[in-house]
């Protein structure tokens, strides 16, 4: 299983690098970034699309038609549309989520940005998100893009993952620490 994951990651990185370099050469990085965000949203919102791109049962032709229709409807750039067509022709659409993630990473690196995965007990307000991004920027010296999710089981506080660093200030983890300390004493 790990081998299959590394193979699809390798495929994704090759497609992402090629698409990134072509977009960079043609000055279309902003368009590429817009396409990536749109595709991520569509994949997240449509389990059927995720199933279609991962299905080995659906023929290349049917996948190509579906991808062309979706790309046309979404107004994706010709470069992204052609890449999706090539991926469907080569039966590589299953790697699309990894391609999008790799592309987002390449673009962020190009822009000098880092992404922080933030899990909060409640939805962050715009002011809170801005303050957190500014604080993290001061810490790492780069522009920080927040990728936020809500997990009510945290009770309160945040979990911030930035690169290999994780900061857990959630009430849930504090209670777990307290529980462990009480077990040791009692």
Swiss-Prot record:
The lineage of its organism: Bacteria, Pseudomonadati, Pseudomonadota, Alphaproteobacteria, Rhodobacterales. Keywords: ATP synthesis, Cell inner membrane, Cell membrane, CF(1), Hydrogen ion transport, Ion transport, Membrane, Transport. This is ATP synthase subunit delta. Pfam families: OSCP. Belongs to the ATPase delta chain family. Coiled coil: none annotated. It is found in: Cell inner membrane. GO terms for molecular function: proton-transporting ATP synthase activity, rotational mechanism. F(1)F(0) ATP synthase produces ATP from ADP in the presence of a proton or sodium gradient. F-type ATPases consist of two structural domains, F(1) containing the extramembraneous catalytic core and F(0) containing the membrane proton channel, linked together by a central stalk and a peripheral stalk. During catalysis, ATP synthesis in the catalytic domain of F(1) is coupled via a rotary mechanism of the central stalk subunits to proton translocation. This protein is part of the stalk that links CF(0) to CF(1). It either transmits conformational changes from CF(0) to CF(1) or is implicated in proton conduction. It comes from Fuscovulum blasticum (Rhodobacter blasticus). GO terms for cellular component: plasma membrane; proton-transporting ATP synthase complex. F-type ATPases have 2 components, F(1) - the catalytic core - and F(0) - the membrane proton channel. F(1) has five subunits: alpha(3), beta(3), gamma(1), delta(1), epsilon(1). F(0) has three main subunits: a(1), b(2) and c(10-14). The alpha and beta chains form an alternating ring which encloses part of the gamma chain. F(1) is attached to F(0) by a central stalk formed by the gamma and epsilon chains, while a peripheral stalk is formed by the delta and b chains. HAMAP family: ATP_synth_delta_bact. It is a peripheral membrane protein.
């Amino acid at each position: 299983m790990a081998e299959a994951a590394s193979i699809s990651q390798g495929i994704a990185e090759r497609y992402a690098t090629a698409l990134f370099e072509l977009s960079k050469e043609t000055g279309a990085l902003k368009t590429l970034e817009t396409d990536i965000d749109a595709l991520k949203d569509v994949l997240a919102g449509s389990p059927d699309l995720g199933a279609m791109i991962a299905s080995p049962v659906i023929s290349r032709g049917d996948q190509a038609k579906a991808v062309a229709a979706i790309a046309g409807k979404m107004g994706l750039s010709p470069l992204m549309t052609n890449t999706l067509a090539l991926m469907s022709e080569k039966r590589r659409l299953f790697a699309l989520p990894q391609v999008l993630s790799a592309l987002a990473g390449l673009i962020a690196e190009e822009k000098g940005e880092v992404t922080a995965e933030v899990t909060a007990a409640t939805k962050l307000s715009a002011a809170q998100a801005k303050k957190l991004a500014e604080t993290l920027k001061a810490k790492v010296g780069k522009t920080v893009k927040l990728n936020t999710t809500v997990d009510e089981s945290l009770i309160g506080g945040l979990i911030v993952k930035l690169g290999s660093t994780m900061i857990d200030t959630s009430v849930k983890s504090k209670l777990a620490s307290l529980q462990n300390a009480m077990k040791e004493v009692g």
